[in-house]
C-alpha cells in the first residue's frame, strides 16, 4: 500500500519545465580542415533574430584571407540560406543586431576601421576615422548604438556612437569617447546594452590599474558618460600570493534584462588555481551593479571556463552560457538566473558529448525562444558552425 501511494504521488507531481531543443543545423556551407571559422566578437553578438528570421555572422579564411560572412534562415525554412560576404579586405570579429521585420545591422573591423551595414539592401558605412577594432552593436526600439576600441595616442580607448537609420541608409548621429582624456593604458573589448528608455550601458576591459579589470559606464543619450566604475569587486593589489597588480578578469558581456535591468557576465581569475570562472553582476535599474556572483555550479570547480556570454529579455529571463571541458572535452553549458542565484549548469544537448563544442553565442527572441550558435570542431573534416533553437516547456 505504501509503495502504491508513493507511485501515485510521483505520477501526480507536475513535470518540471525545461528547454526543448530543435535538431541542430549547420550554418556554414563551406568547410575543410584548412578553413577556420571564428565566432569571437566583442560582447559575443554573433546571432540575432528579427521578425521570424535568424541571422548568424562569423569570420573564416576560405578565400585565403580572413573575411566576414552572414547567413540567414527564415523560421519556415529547413536550412540556412547560402551565406553572403560582408567584407572586401581582411575582416575580423563581426557582430549583428536585429532591427525588426527581418532586417539587421551588422558591424565588423576591416582595414583597421570599424564598419557597419544594414541588411538586406544597405550600403557599408565607415564608423571610425581613426584605427579601430572590436566593434559591437546594441539596439532597442528606436535607439541603436555601436562601440569600438579606437587608437588614441599610444593606447586604445572606448568610443560609443549613436546610429540613426532612414530607410536603408545608416549614419552616425553622435560619436563620443567614454572618457575625454587619452587613456593611460589599453582599453578594449567593449560590450553594450540598451534599455527601453534609450539609455546605454557600456562595459570594457581596462588596464589602467596595470591588470585587466572590467569597467562600466552609462549614458542617457550617448552624449555624456558617467565616471567609469569597476564591475569586479576585487580590489587592485589583491592578487593571490602578492603576485602582480591584481587578479585578472576579461571579456565583459552585457544584456538588457527585465523592465530596466542590465546584467553583466565576464571571465574572472580570482581563483587563480582553477583558471577563469564565470562571474556576473546585476543592475536592477539603479545604474549601479551589485555584488559579484559566481555563475557555474560546483561541478565546474577546478575547471577553466571560456567564452562566457549573457542573454536576457524584457520578461525577466536571464541566462549565462559558456564552454568548459568538465566531462573531458569542451561542451557548451548554460545556467539560468532564478531571482536569487544561478541554477544548476545544463549542457546544451547538441553542443555536448564527443568532440569539441565551444564558443557559444546566443539570443532570446520576442517570444522567449533561445537561439544558440557554436563551433563544432573536427580536425579532419573541418569546423561546422552549428545552430539550435529551444523553447521553454
Task: Give short role names for the model-derived ranges.
Residues 17-393:
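Extracellular, repeat-based ectodomains that mediate carbohydrate processing or recognition
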Amino acid at each position: 500500500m505504501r509503495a502504491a501511494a508513493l507511485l501515485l504521488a510521483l505520477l501526480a507531481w507536475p513535470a518540471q519545465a525545461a528547454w526543448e531543443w530543435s535538431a541542430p543545423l549547420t550554418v556554414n556551407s563551406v568547410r575543410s580542415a584548412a578553413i577556420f571559422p571564428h565566432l569571437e566578437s566583442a560582447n559575443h553578438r554573433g546571432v540575432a533574430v528579427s521578425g521570424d528570421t535568424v541571422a548568424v555572422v562569423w569570420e573564416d579564411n576560405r578565400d585565403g584571407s580572413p573575411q566576414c560572412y552572414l547567413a540567414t534562415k527564415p523560421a519556415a525554412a529547413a536550412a540556412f540560406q547560402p551565406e553572403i560576404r560582408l567584407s572586401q579586405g581582411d575582416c575580423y570579429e563581426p557582430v549583428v543586431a536585429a532591427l525588426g521585420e527581418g532586417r539587421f545591422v551588422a558591424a565588423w573591423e576591416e582595414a583597421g576601421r570599424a564598419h557597419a551595414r544594414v541588411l538586406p539592401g544597405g550600403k557599408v558605412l565607415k564608423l571610425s576615422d581613426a584605427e579601430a577594432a572590436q566593434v559591437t552593436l546594441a539596439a532597442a526600439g528606436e535607439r541603436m548604438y555601436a562601440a569600438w576600441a579606437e587608437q588614441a595616442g599610444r593606447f586604445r580607448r572606448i568610443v560609443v556612437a549613436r546610429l540613426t537609420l532612414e530607410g536603408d541608409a545608416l549614419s552616425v548621429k553622435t560619436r563620443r569617447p567614454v572618457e575625454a582624456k587619452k587613456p593611460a593604458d589599453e582599453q578594449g573589448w567593449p560590450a553594450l546594452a540598451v534599455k527601453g528608455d534609450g539609455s546605454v550601458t557600456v562595459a570594457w576591459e581596462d588596464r589602467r590599474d596595470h591588470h585587466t579589470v572590467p569597467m562600466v559606464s552609462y549614458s542617457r543619450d550617448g552624449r555624456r558618460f558617467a565616471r567609469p566604475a569597476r564591475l569586479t569587486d576585487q580590489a587592485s593589489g589583491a592578487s593571490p600570493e602578492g603576485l602582480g597588480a591584481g587578479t585578472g578578469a576579461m571579456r565583459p558581456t552585457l544584456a538588457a534584462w527585465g523592465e530596466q535591468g542590465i546584467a553583466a557576465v565576464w571571465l574572472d581569475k580570482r581563483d587563480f588555481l582553477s583558471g577563469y570562472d564565470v562571474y556576473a553582476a546585476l543592475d536592477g535599474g539603479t545604474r549601479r551593479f551589485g555584488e559579484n556572483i559566481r555563475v557555474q555550479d560546483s561541478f565546474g570547480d577546478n575547471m577553466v571556463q571560456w567564452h562566457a556570454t549573457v542573454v536576457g529579455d524584457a520578461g525577466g529571463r536571464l541566462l549565462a552560457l559558456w564552454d568548459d571541458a568538465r566531462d573531458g572535452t569542451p561542451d557548451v553549458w548554460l545556467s539560468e538566473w532564478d531571482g536569487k542565484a544561478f541554477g544548476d549548469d545544463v549542457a546544451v544537448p547538441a553542443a555536448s558529448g564527443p568532440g569539441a563544442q565551444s564558443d557559444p553565442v546566443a539570443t532570446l527572441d520576442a517570444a522567449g525562444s533561445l537561439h544558440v550558435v557554436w563551433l563544432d570542431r573536427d580536425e579532419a573534416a573541418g569546423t561546422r558552425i552549428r545552430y539550435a533553437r529551444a523553447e521553454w516547456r
